[in-house]
């Protein structure tokens, strides 16, 4: 049905919230449609960032049936049972590492049983990426690439294959292999802001700054047309502008985030501003007003953005000979490391 298919396409492009809404709409049309529950449950898993809302996903499955056995009996076909078994593995007992491994094995079995199912094979590729959590394991990433390449050969417009190829090749060594997928992906999924942004990961690695600027302008426009901030694309756009010597354009972008924070100081907006100011400081080496003001981090759990900002302020202070200020930032970094070790994840892959 259309709602389910829309949710599936959005899921392949990591538009998790929008995908969830579509899967719920599919359930409303047909409360017994097992795959709509599968999709909603899977939307709570963000493998490239090592994040997962286990409680919410299990609640979705509970709406389908009170036990695994009860849920499996509602699957109408062998293929549906395979899909459902995959999320049962992902959200079952055990540690996240154990559940991710079982999810990978379940999708491997499904893809082997139904090799014509390009979505199953694409999700299998994604599950290889998810085995690495927030780190990059080259062997697993190349396994993901091999599976996604096989899907690409059959359907070069498959959004999952294109997206996961970009992620699999997202490093300076493998980036040339990802250029083909990067060129296609944004055109295949024009309504997904993430799909517009992701090709710039490859463009960044290859120093293709004009292409990176174009991709992130498109991503930002798509996000804003849907009522989203599009801040991740904005940060990358500002960085790409600086690489092209477009300092004034980059400054306007960073200032626009500060203006948004002044109007609406949400945790997300403030985190973005910390990232943006850190980037400005490192790239320009200038401790001007653009980068100098601290950002309120009240109520923000993630340490990464503010650690990056402390680091940038410390580097600029050290370069200018202000040893005391540099040491103060170093102490702040150490304190963050001591109190929130392991929280800084999910940046490179996003």
Each model region followed by its residue ranges:
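Hydrophobic, small-residue-rich alpha-helical packing segments that form membrane-like cores
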Residues: 125, 138-191, 195, 202-205, ...
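Amphipathic alpha-helical repeat scaffolds of TPR domains
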Residues: 1-5, 32-44, 72-94, 116-133, ...
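Acidic, proline/glycine-rich low-complexity intrinsically disordered segments
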Residues: 1-95, 103, 107-121, 144
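Long hydrophobic segments that form regular secondary structure
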Residues: 9, 124, 238, 245-339
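Solenoid-like repeat scaffolds
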Residues: 26-29, 111-113, 152-154, 183-191, ...
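Short coil/turn linking the two alpha-helices of tandem helical-hairpin repeats
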Residues: 8, 14-15, 41, 45-51, ...
């Amino acid at each position: 049905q259309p709602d389910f298919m829309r949710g599936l396409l959005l899921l392949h492009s990591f538009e998790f919230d929008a995908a969830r809404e579509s899967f719920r709409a599919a359930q409303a049309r047909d409360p017994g449609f097992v795959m709509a529950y599968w999709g909603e449950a899977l939307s709570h898993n963000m493998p490239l960032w090592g994040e997962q809302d286990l409680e919410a996903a299990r609640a979705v499955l509970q709406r389908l049936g009170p036990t695994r056995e009860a849920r499996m009996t509602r699957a109408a076909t062998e293929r549906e049972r395979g899909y459902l078994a995959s999320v049962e593995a992902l959200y079952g007992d055990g540690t996240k590492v154990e559940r991710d491994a079982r999810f990978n094995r379940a999708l491997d079995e499904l893809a082997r049983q139904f090799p014509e199912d390009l979505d199953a094979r694409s999700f299998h590729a994604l599950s290889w990426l998810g085995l690495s959590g927030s780190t990059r394991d080259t062997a697993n990433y190349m396994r993901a690439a091999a599976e996604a390449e096989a899907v690409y050969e059959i359907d070069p417009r498959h959004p999952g294959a294109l997206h996961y190829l970009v992620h699999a090749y997202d490093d300076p060594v493998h980036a040339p292999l990802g250029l083909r997928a990067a060129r296609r992906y944004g055109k295949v999924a024009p309504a997904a802001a993430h799909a517009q942004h992701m090709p710039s990961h490859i463009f960044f690695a290859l120093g293709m700054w004009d292409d990176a600027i174009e991709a992130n302008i498109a991503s930002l426009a798509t996000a804003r047309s849907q009522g989203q901030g599009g801040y991740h694309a904005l940060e990358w756009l500002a960085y790409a502008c600086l690489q092209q010597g477009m300092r004034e354009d980059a400054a306007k972008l960073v200032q626009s985030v500060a203006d948004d924070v002044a109007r609406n100081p949400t945790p997300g907006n403030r985190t973005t501003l910390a990232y943006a100011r850190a980037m400005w400081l490192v790239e320009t080496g200038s401790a001007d007003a653009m980068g100098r003001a601290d950002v309120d981090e009240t109520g923000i759990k993630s340490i990464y953005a503010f650690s990056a900002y402390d680091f940038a302020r410390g580097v600029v202070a050290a370069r200018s000979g202000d040893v005391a200020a540099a040491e103060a930032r170093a102490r702040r970094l150490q304190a963050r490391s001591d109190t929130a070790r392991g929280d800084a994840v999910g940046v490179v892959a996003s």
